[in-house]
Amino acid sequence: SIGLGHAANEELKFVFDEKLVSTPTFAMILAHHLPWLRQPETGIDVRKMLHGESSLVVHHPLPKAGHVTVHGRIAGVVDRGPGKSVSIYFEQRVIESATASHLATVGGCFVFPGAGVAVGATGARPGTTPTKVPDGCADIEFVDHIPKNAAQLYRLNGDRNTLHVDPEVARRAGFDRPILHGLCTFGYAGAAAIRTLCDHDAGRVEKLHVRYSTPIYPGEQLRTEFFRIDTNEYAFRCIAVERNVTVLEAGHLVLRNEK
């Protein structure tokens, strides 16, 4: 929560241990361990891996303490042909160990540029078609300032990829400096929804989906633009303000009714 900029006043409950409430996007951290990515027999080169999409469905509010079991599966593989990209879609079910309660379903996609081998495209994208963000002005906007130490703070959650902290590694990957974790940017989008649309009630977030477009750098401003589709449904995108580039696109948010 601290890594997403939650602090005082209405957000004290997200950072004060005596009144602690979990944020819904914490489920992404619980489900982040994907051991198959590093198994030699897969032939996957994680150094060339890009984060393509992330999705979250919250079935029950996350407890502030406890143990969970994560059941994962490969949901689909799309090979776009020789010299083109391969996309691997996955799904992780977060289960509370003590009660067997299904807390959340986390999905996502990793993209491997140039890894295609099939003659002709094979496979199909699982799930629904990504949401198209409408043209025109957003119904609601929220601007966050991403702290310069945001990647170091988020790294404490267990994502130790040096791309987000080592300037030399970032330069070798083609970036000016270390970039912010994609899942941290996802978390900022969720936090913007809680602040602007949910009156700080984290329990109202039911579904969240994004497609990653361009990384954002710590120290930049992030503008989240929400477009109302229905009473509790929004399309959204996130923009790095200083460079005026979209960093999260095809965003889709579904809220629960107010209690």
Question: What do the predicted segments below correspond to?
Answer:
Residues 145-223, 227-234:
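Acidic/His-leaning functional-site neighborhoods
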Residues 16-20, 30-34, 53-54, 60-62, ...:
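Solvent-exposed, flexible loop/coil residues
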Residues 1, 26-27, 73, 109, ...:
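Residue-level recognition of well-ordered secondary-structure positions
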Residues 1-21, 110-180, 194:
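Catalytic strand-loop segment that frames the active site of acyl-thioester-processing enzymes
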Residues 11-15, 25-28, 43, 48-49, ...:
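Residue-level preference for alpha-helix termini and adjacent loops
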Residues 1-69, 257:
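Hydrophobic, proline/glycine-rich low-complexity stretches
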Residues 49-142, 216-219, 223-259:
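HotDog/MaoC-like acyl-thioester-processing domains
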